[in-house]
Amino acid sequence: MHGITFDIAHMLAGSLVLVSFMQLYQDRLYALLNIYALHALVLAASVAWQAFIQDAPHRYLTAVIALVFKAIIIPTALHRIIVRLGIHREIETVVGVGPAMLLGMGLVALSMVVMLRVTADADPLAREDLAFALSVVLLGLLMMVTRRNAVSQVVGFMSLENGLVLAATGAKGMPLVVEISVAFSVLIAFIVIGIFLFRIRERFDTVDVSALDQFRGERGDRM
């Protein structure tokens, strides 16, 4: 597994990290959802390529799931939620874009150092893909931490899960049932979070999670 196949696998995994940075940089909800759709599209391409080079036809089903659910259905549904909630605005962040990007670069560097050392005896392609996957996971987690808007936190969570799928497909012999269970777990979580967003909107007239903190503080003062 060398030459062009090796290079394409790395290019796709690296592209997923790059798109994760694009999500971290974005400060508008519509654009963020479009970039997440691109994130899922790159994931689907990466999984399909892994299916080809590993000669694992069942991986193609995982790629189709990523393409249909993650790149089309979920972004479309979130677009509709945004329209119904009337939250066409910029995303409020805990820290600025600059510090967030610097933190992201630090997390990617940490991922590379840790994974390449821990997996020193593993297959070269697998260990580098795992390093990229951990980078995607940590960038998704960073996005959840640095965003106040609940919708953007949902996108961060789904991006994190994309990193887990990348790690699972990069490891040979990973059962398909694991990948399917992860995908449907995210779908269920998406439904629950969608209901939760409507409840927040009805109660607080906003989806900014800082409203919840303020409400808890007011209740604490009364008690």
List the model feature ranges, each with a label:
Residues M1-M223:
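Alpha-helical transmembrane segments of multi-pass membrane proteins predominantly involved
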